[in-house]
């Protein structure tokens, strides 16, 4: 456990950041799931619109360091391939 005022404060901040980041990751996953559900339903227009939102969300998370930039690129590539395969 934290033995100094500084360590206590850092522990508080770390927990606050952890909870914030978890919420951000969950929101990102939700945007990706919306795209995949639109693809499963066969609605290309909805999938394309949802992909724009998901792409922005993935890039944002990569920029902030919540996910690796390669993971963001890989996810965008795979989702886009699934949308293109619908045609």
Swiss-Prot record:
GO terms for cellular component: cytosol; small ribosomal subunit. Residues 1-27 are annotated as: Disordered. The keyword RNA-binding applies. One of its GO terms (molecular function) is small ribosomal subunit rRNA binding. The keyword Iron does not apply. InterPro entries: Ribosomal_bS20, Ribosomal_bS20_sf. NCBIfam families: S20. Binds directly to 16S ribosomal RNA. This is Small ribosomal subunit protein bS20. It comes from Hydrogenovibrio crunogenus (strain DSM 25203 / XCL-2) (Thiomicrospira crunogena). The lineage of its organism: Bacteria, Pseudomonadati, Pseudomonadota, Gammaproteobacteria, Thiotrichales. The gene is rpsT.
